[in-house]
């Protein structure tokens, strides 16, 4: 049993370090910005002030914007899934990057990462089929 627990701890540790390594070299590593408090995960994830209905111990403020989406031959739609809304909490330009942990921030995403709220000329985003679950196809 001790060997199993040690092996399990090693696997979990390696998985966590791999996730940390991926974000530490990405544009989502905000640890060098003063508003992040030097934290790499806290602007998005934390057990305190988390919004459990959004999953992943989500800590960042959610956008309340209305989106216009491409919906193929039927025109546009306003149906948008939660996972896409998590990303757009920063990337639609309506919520500050430093709006997390129950605070309201003042630092907004720059033009290169700001996707706005009009997706009528984009590929389908924000739909369940974009993120298929096991047993489904897209």
Residue ranges and their predicted role:
Residues 7, 11, 17-42, 46-138:
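C-type cytochrome heme-c attachment and multiheme electron-transfer modules
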């Amino acid at each position: 049993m001790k060997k199993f627990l040690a092996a399990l701890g090693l696997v979990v540790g390696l998985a966590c370090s791999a996730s940390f390594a991926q974000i530490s070299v990405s544009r989502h590593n905000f640890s060098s910005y003063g508003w992040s408090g030097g934290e790499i995960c806290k602007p998005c994830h934390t057990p305190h002030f988390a919004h459990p209905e959004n999953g992943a111990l989500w800590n960042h403020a959610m956008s309340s914007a209305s989106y216009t989406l491409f919906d193929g031959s039927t025109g546009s739609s306003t149906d948008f899934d939660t996972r896409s809304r998590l990303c757009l909490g920063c990337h639609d330009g309506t919520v500050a990057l430093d709006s997390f942990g129950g605070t309201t921030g003042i630092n907004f995403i720059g033009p290169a990462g700001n996707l706005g709220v009009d997706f009528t000329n984009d590929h389908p985003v924000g739909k369940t089929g974009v993120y298929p679950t096991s047993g489904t196809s897209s």
